Regions:
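A short, flexible beta-alpha/helix-coil linker loop
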Residues: 37-40, 73, 133-135, 170-174
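Active-site mouth loops of central-metabolism enzymes
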Residues: 40-46, 101-108, 173-181
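Canonical Radical SAM [4Fe-4S] cluster-binding loop centered on the CxxxCxxC motif
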Residues: 4-47
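Conserved C-terminal portion of the radical SAM core fold
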Residues: 125, 148-183
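Short microdomains enriched in Cys/His and/or Lys/Arg
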Residues: 44-60
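An acidic, carboxylate-rich microenvironment
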Residues: 47-48, 80, 149, 181
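Conserved hydrophobic beta-strand within the GNAT/NAT acetyltransferase core sheet
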Residues: 19-21, 100-102, 166
Length: 183
């Protein structure tokens, strides 16, 4: 299996199979995050994805769920995500659901119709690290987007009927920004 930036996953994905389709983080500028500091962002070549899917199939594990690796696999274009799902179905034809991390701005390049289509294909969850809903905290932490972007993109997810979860970092505002962050 190809894992160039290690495995990072939410606790509830512990039983999932992991497939690297990107490595590192496309933004990689958040002040608090060290997960991907040593891993430049890159997209896994199709050959590596095929090799990993072949290895999963050969293991005999009847995988039910895949959690895509990399901080931002949903930054990939709709057509690339479709191709990845086609490969998953080719190698694991019994049907699996797929989720992964995504930045809020990574779904900006996808229409509601494309998000609906991704859901129908089997992509059923994006985990967004929003961290805060306060613009001052988002700016201080160098997230690269604002609360209005969060609302806009998650509303698009709602309209598409695609599930998501969010990571909120309690205490991120510290003493100076704590009240705005908490509210």
């Amino acid at each position: 299996m190809h894992f160039s930036s290690g495995i990072v996953r939410p606790p509830y994905e512990a039983g999932s199979c992991f497939l690297q389709v990107t490595s590192g983080c496309s933004h990689n500028k958040c002040r608090f995050c060290t997960f991907y500091k040593e891993a430049p962002f890159s997209v896994s070549p199709e050959r590596e994805i095929r090799e990993d899917l072949q290895e999963i199939r050969d293991s005999g594990w009847k995988v039910k769920r895949i959690f895509l690796q990399g901080a931002d696999p949903f930054l990939l274009s709709y057509s690339r995500l479709k191709r990845i799902m086609d490969l998953i179905k080719e190698y694991l034809p019994w049907g699996v659901s797929v989720g992964g991390y995504g930045r809020v701005d990574s779904v900006k390049n996808k229409s509601v119709e494309q998000l609906k289509s991704l859901k129908e294909m089997g992509y059923d969850m994006i985990v967004f690290g929003i961290e805060s809903g306060d613009d001052a905290v988002l700016d201080k932490m160098n997230k690269g987007y604002h609360a209005s972007d969060i609302v806009e993109q998650l509303s698009k997810m709602d309209e598409a009927g695609m599930h998501y979860s969010v990571i909120f970092l309690y205490g991120l505002g510290g003493h100076e920004y704590g009240m705005g962050h908490a509210v």
